[in-house]
Amino acid sequence: MTGIIHSLLDTDLYKFTMLQVVLHQFPQTHSLYEFRCRNASTVYPLADIKEDLEAELDALCRLRFTHDELGYLRSLRFIKSDFVDYLELFQLQRRFVEIGTDDKDRLNIRIEGPMIQAMFFEIFILAIVNELYFRRLETPAVIEEGERRLQAKAARLKEIAAAQNPDDPPFLISDFGTRRRYKLAWQEHVIRTLLEAAPSIVRGTSNVFLAKKLGITPIGTMAHEFLQAFQALDVRLRNFQKAALESWVHEYRGDLGVALTDVVGMDAFLRDFDLYFAKLFDGLRHDSGDPYVWGDKAYAHYQKLKIDSRTKMLTFSDGLDIERSWALHQYFKDRFKTGFGIGTNLTNDMGHTPLNIVLKLVECNGQSVAKLSDSPGKTMTNNSTFLAYLRQVFDVPEPETP
């Protein structure tokens, strides 16, 4: 039986862009990732899929990159030849992943090992958990409902394409839904359907396998884990964001220039995002908090630095659907170029409640790391003392409890 994952390209582009920096600049880094399901309840306990998950992981760890896949990676201008040579030898090691269950029938997953291994497991494991969970819930009615919703999205994108003013910056969306997809075949069907409906709007996908297969642009730069790692590397905690951005610049020399802003919140990020970074980076990515407030703060920051914000891009990727994306585009289009990464709403909108699952970096080199985020529910760490210290260092107040 073929595993759920049958290609090591079946992951998000930013795994490759981050891994390249890790390999070149801090290859000895050790990391710990922990799984969390944020759903209050599920149709059946996730513990029930443990045995199948173990088998899928065994299959995943037998995969290697093919010459064709390596050739595709070499064709991306920001991927360096020595990194592709490393990937030719690469194989995920099963011993770095522990799977267990607790007395509440919850699934426990820990990935602990070298960051150049541990970081690469995340998307694969989340996609496997999703597919195993929803496989047991699939009926013809579920697929029918998914198709009905997909066709409504395609029709809406056609309307938007017709309504766009050619003098405005374009409205562009990308698929960011690999980690929470229903299954790979459905993700491909969604992208093909929307591409056919509105080729001027659908910019690409974060999924490298599907970008290669469909001949569209792979999208992505960095994730929270990249910046968080610098909380435990050899820099003062106060300077970790600057060190991470500097490291990125050193690797990519102006390429892949979208910076993620919410590891310790937008206000703390902007204090570090000085004229040098603001000129060098093409734009910013929003992943938590009120997107309108966030974008207005970005605009004020560029104004203060006397940078024309119309030359910069705001990328939004937090819980979006087509309507929210279009509304944000209307609000910001006269001040910024915009881009929208839509995840679960594209790849797992089938009528069931989607799983809100994450596999987050919680330790690096034996030291706690954390994300404060602009949305309190997205804060994640295994060390509340470190979290309090991080708040103090970056002057981030405790979120108000309702």
Curated annotation (Swiss-Prot):
Q: Which residues carry this modification: Phosphohistidine?
A: H224
What biological-process GO terms show up in the record? NAD biosynthetic process via the salvage pathway
Q: Which reaction does it catalyse?
A: nicotinate + 5-phospho-alpha-D-ribose 1-diphosphate + ATP + H2O = nicotinate beta-D-ribonucleotide + ADP + phosphate + diphosphate
Which top EC class applies here?
A: ligase
Q: In which pathway does it act?
A: Cofactor biosynthesis; NAD(+) biosynthesis; nicotinate D-ribonucleotide from nicotinate: step 1/1
Superkingdom of the organism of origin:
Bacteria
**What Gene Ontology molecular function terms does this protein carry?**
nicotinate phosphoribosyltransferase activity
Keywords carried by this UniProt record: Ligase, Phosphoprotein, Pyridine nucleotide biosynthesis
State the Pfam families in the record: NAPRTase (PF04095), NAPRTase_N (PF17767)
PTM comment: the record says: Transiently phosphorylated on a His residue during the reaction cycle. Phosphorylation strongly increases the affinity for substrates and increases the rate of nicotinate D-ribonucleotide production. Dephosphorylation regenerates the low-affinity form of the enzyme, leading to product release.
User: Into which family does the record put it?
Assistant: Belongs to the NAPRTase family.
Functional description taken from the UniProt entry: Catalyzes the synthesis of beta-nicotinate D-ribonucleotide from nicotinate and 5-phospho-D-ribose 1-phosphate at the expense of ATP.
Official protein name in the record: Nicotinate phosphoribosyltransferase
